[in-house]
Amino acid sequence: MYTILVVDDSPMIVDVFVTMLERGGYRPITAFSGEECLEVLKTTPPDLVLLDIMMEPMDGWETLGKIKTDPATRGIPVLMLTAKPLTPEEANEYGAFIEDYILKPTTHHQLYEAIEHVLARRHSITADIERAREAGIDPRIIDEYERLSKGVDINRRLLKILETTYSIKDA
């Protein structure tokens, strides 16, 4: 059972996501602010973080930055969860640090698909890395492979979000 940290400053929204995750067979844990999220990560590292963007005083982007600059937490995948459409500037600035971007409101199917996609990609890359290490491939090449594999997939997903949000394909 995967543990997922839900971070949102609205207790009602946290409750909704906790219920959805429990019904999906996940083990949710919660935080109600960016600071609380960082504290929870120190004691109970999850398999994945669902992080709201529009929180105060520390918003989700700042919280994401702190997660990704801490060596102890940088490897934890983060899905941004927000009612705010992704802007091209945000995709460019934060795309390398997030695993996916989920717009609220969302359905349980969309949530589960995003979570499973991230976890499956993570397992696939981890297996590839293990095989590469066993084959004696240079660790620098392995690190670059990991970075590029994740980046290509995330950029495809962000591109799809931007195309949908801004009707780019219909223009």
Show where each model-derived region lies.
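Charged docking surfaces used in two-component/phosphorelay signaling
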Residues: 15-23
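Helix N-cap/capping motif at the beta->alpha junctions
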Residues: 30-39, 60
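Short amphipathic alpha-helix used as the core "switch/output" element in two-component signaling
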Residues: 39, 61-74
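Active-site beta3 strand of CheY-like receiver
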Residues: 44-50
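Receiver (REC) domain active-site loop signature in two-component systems and cognate sites
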Residues: 55
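Alpha4 helix (beta4-alpha4-beta5 surface) of REC/receiver domains from two-component response regulators
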Residues: 62, 85-102, 109-113, 126
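CheY-like receiver
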Residues: 121-171
